[in-house]
């Protein structure tokens, strides 16, 4: 499982740690906010509607950030824009800690979301272009496991600060703490370079990325199906993760057990990232994503039907993290292998972040449907529809395991059903 890392060049290892740390920091800043909402609500007397806007605005604007960062990355380089994205969301996260009103915090969170959208696609493309095609799934998948680390750190930091400091100060310090891990920017600027593949593409006569690139009919079918895939995966994930605490509360699971469950879910997601990363290189991107989509829905149904106790809650929490979150380890390699180098991050950023923004609508959908059929049934229904949506997109996209992404041309981009040549090592 780790042979790819041991065999990697110093530059590949530095790139891995830069992308891993950037994604962990992104997760830390994003997940921290969810743990601070109760303190903010108490301090400023926010309504549920205001809390809802604060909680979703960053997710919505990630679509713009991902699209914009993708275009800039395809034009000016992956490493440079990765640094910019990290600086951006760190800066506005720190400024959020100085907010004196709801309106100021809303503006800071909105601007911070632009940076969140930019980091994922740029980091995934950078990693895809420097790693050997035989190990691309494992490498990018392990980068994705940085999400679990950032999530766990957010739980620890938020819990300690809220326990040690007055609530009106704790949330501010929590936002300010995001600047410490951002020192990774100094490492990236000094040690991480763009791949030779990207440099060759930039010097070629291939058309440069622009705002209109994603509307080019050459990429339209692949981009549309990629977006459908991401919408399904994100909708299912949000339907489970956002509403799970409420479901556990309905089942009268103790608050202490719920905190433990969050840690177990984070650990489960880390294990899921590792296994998914390896599995996608062994059996392919499509079978891996389909298998885990089915598993995630089964776990959700189990929450609906089984009588929950402490042990079962912990087991199912691990399985939720493993399947619903861990499956994203196969998404980065898959999307990076679908588009040519000259528009790779533009299309990846659009598909991932637009899909994420639309998929987040499942949070509202579950809430509305739950008033008619109950929360557990609403979660199960939405997850079934979401993962069926994802599988539909997967089935119409090609298997890409092991392809040489430097050879992806414009013909490949608009003919996803066409067979893609794979090296013998990838097929074995």
UniProtKB/Swiss-Prot annotation:
Organism for this UniProt entry: Cupriavidus pinatubonensis (strain JMP 134 / LMG 1197) (Cupriavidus necator (strain JMP 134))
Periplasmic-side positions: 48-50, 102-110, 167, 249-252, 309-314, 372-377
GO cellular component, one term: plasma membrane
Cytoplasmic side: 1-26, 72-80, 132-145, 189-227, 274-287, 336-356, 399-428
Function: Probable uptake of 4-methylmuconolactone.
Protein name (Swiss-Prot/TrEMBL): Probable 4-methylmuconolactone transporter
Main location, first listed in the record: membrane
InterPro entries per UniProt: MFS (IPR011701), MFS_dom (IPR020846), MFS_trans_sf (IPR036259), Sugar_transporter_CS (IPR005829)
Family: Belongs to the major facilitator superfamily. Sugar transporter (TC 2.A.1.1) family.
Gene: mmlH
Transmembrane among keywords: yes
Membrane-traversing stretches: 27-47, 51-71, 81-101, 111-131, 146-166, 168-188, 228-248, 253-273, 288-308, 315-335, 357-371, 378-398
Cellular location(s): Cell inner membrane
């Amino acid at each position: 499982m780790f042979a790819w890392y041991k065999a990697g060049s110093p530059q590949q290892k530095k790139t891995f740690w830069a992308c891993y740390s950037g994604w962990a920091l992104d997760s830390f800043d994003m997940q921290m906010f969810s743990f601070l909402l109760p303190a903010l609500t108490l301090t400023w007397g926010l309504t549920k509607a205001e809390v809802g806007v604060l909680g979703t605005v960053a997710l919505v604007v990630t679509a713009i950030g991902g699209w914009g960062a993708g275009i800039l990355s395809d034009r000016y380089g992956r490493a440079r824009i990765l640094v910019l994205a990290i600086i951006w969301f760190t800066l506005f996260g720190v400024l959020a800690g100085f907010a004196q009103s709801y309106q100021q915090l809303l503006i800071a969170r909105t601007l911070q979301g632009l940076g969140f959208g930019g980091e994922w696609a740029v980091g995934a493309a950078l990693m895809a272009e420097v790693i050997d095609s035989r190990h691309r799934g494992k490498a990018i998948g392990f980068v994705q496991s940085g999400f679990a680390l950032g999530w766990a750190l957010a739980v620890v930091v938020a819990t300690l600060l809220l326990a040690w400091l007055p609530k009106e100060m704790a949330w501010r310090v929590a936002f300010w703490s995001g600047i410490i891990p951002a020192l990774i920017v100094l490492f990236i600027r000094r040690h991480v370079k763009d791949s030779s593949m990207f440099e060759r593409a930039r010097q070629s006569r291939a058309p440069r990325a622009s705002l209109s690139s994603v509307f080019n009919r050459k990429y339209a079918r692949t981009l549309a199906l990629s977006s459908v895939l991401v919408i399904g995966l994100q909708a299912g994930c949000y339907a489970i993760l956002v509403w799970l605490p409420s479901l556990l509360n309905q089942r009268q699971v103790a608050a202490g057990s719920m905190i433990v469950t969050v840690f177990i879910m984070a650990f489960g997601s880390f294990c899921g990232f590792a296994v998914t990363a390896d599995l996608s290189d062994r059996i392919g991107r499509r079978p891996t994503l389909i298998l885990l989509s089915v598993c995630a829905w089964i776990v959700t149904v189990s929450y609906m039907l089984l009588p929950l106790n402490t042990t079962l809650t912990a087991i199912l929490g691990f399985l939720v993290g493993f399947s619903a979150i861990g499956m994203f380890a196969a998404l980065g390699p898959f999307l990076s292998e679908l588009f040519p180098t000259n528009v790779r991050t533009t299309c990846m950023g659009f598909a991932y972040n637009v899909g994420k923004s639309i998929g987040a609508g499942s949070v509202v959908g579950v809430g509305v449907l739950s008033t008619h059929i109950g929360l557990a049934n609403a979660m199960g229904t939405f997850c079934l529809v979401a993962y069926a949506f994802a599988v539909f997109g997967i089935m119409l996209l090609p298997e890409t395991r092991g392809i040489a992404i430097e050879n992806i041309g414009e013909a490949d981009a608009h003919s996803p059903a066409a067979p893609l040549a794979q090296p013998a090592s990838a097929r074995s």
